[in-house]
Amino acid sequence: MILGNILKKNGLKQGIDMKLLAGDLPTGVASTFISPDGERTFGTYLGAAATMKAENLTLDMFKGYAYLYIEGYLVQDHELILRAMQLGKEAGLQICLDMASYNIVEGDLEFFDILITKYVDIVFANEEEAKAYTGKDAWGAINEIASKCSVVIVKLGAQGSCIKKGTECIKLEVPPVKKLVDTTGAGDYYAAGFLYGLTCGYSLEKCSIIGSILASNVIQVVGTTLSKKKWDEIKLNIEALLQA
């Protein structure tokens, strides 16, 4: 529980309403191995996370929110992810799915298709994950996925990102990066910035700009924690770009 308590304390400090379940096993851990070029590989111990069951979820947990963001890793428990999405829909939330990993997608392709077609409103994927799902390159993949959900975002690494909603298509370049140190958290920061933009009512282009700014900053540090000074700089940068 030590790591779990640290997570809870930090979340509450940031004003997050933490809905955590306690179990007998230790908190899960993901050890990150960073290569010289800044790419990363995870070694994971799921711990208590593996004991979470569909019956642990209640409708009250989903009330008062606008979006439910689910990592594709959760598809390993079909019953759990289905209940989460069903409760989210019942509570009136938009469902966001991050495909998580191309091998996860390849290993459960039919189930991913059911989720996206029936429940998911917004899909986040990188180029490899989108190709694993559709068998097509970036634009071919984005067109196919967009035919099954409301919004699809395909992240292209250093090449930026593609976003499509209906007939609206956007291609954005990535902000300049001084030095790539560690790609851990880049996708999560992008999604966080994008969803923040949506909750503020910004256009898809501005949502993507915010996500790209966050992602480009986190890859320049080891780990996923940015200093208060850096956050202040990021906020000013975002405000300037949004007003331009």
Give the residues covered by each predicted segment.
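Conserved phosphate-binding/catalytic loop of the ribokinase/pfkB sugar-kinase fold
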Residues: K19-G23, T32-H78
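Short beta-strand scaffold segments in enzyme catalytic cores
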Residues: V29-F33, T41, G160-K164
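Short, acidic/turn-prone active-site loops that include or flank metal/cofactor-
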Residues: L46-A49, A100-Y102, P175-K178
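Conserved phosphate-binding/catalytic region of the ribokinase-like
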Residues: Q86, E90, A138-A244
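Alpha-helix C-terminal capping/helix-to-coil transition sites in glycosyltransferase folds
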Residues: K63-G64, K118-Y119, K148
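Conserved beta-alpha-beta core of the PfkB/ribokinase-like small-molecule kinase fold
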Residues: Y67-N143, Q159-S161
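Substrate-binding N-lobe of the ribokinase-like
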Residues: M1-V29, D232-A244
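Hydrophobic beta-strand scaffold residues
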Residues: M18, I95-C96, V152
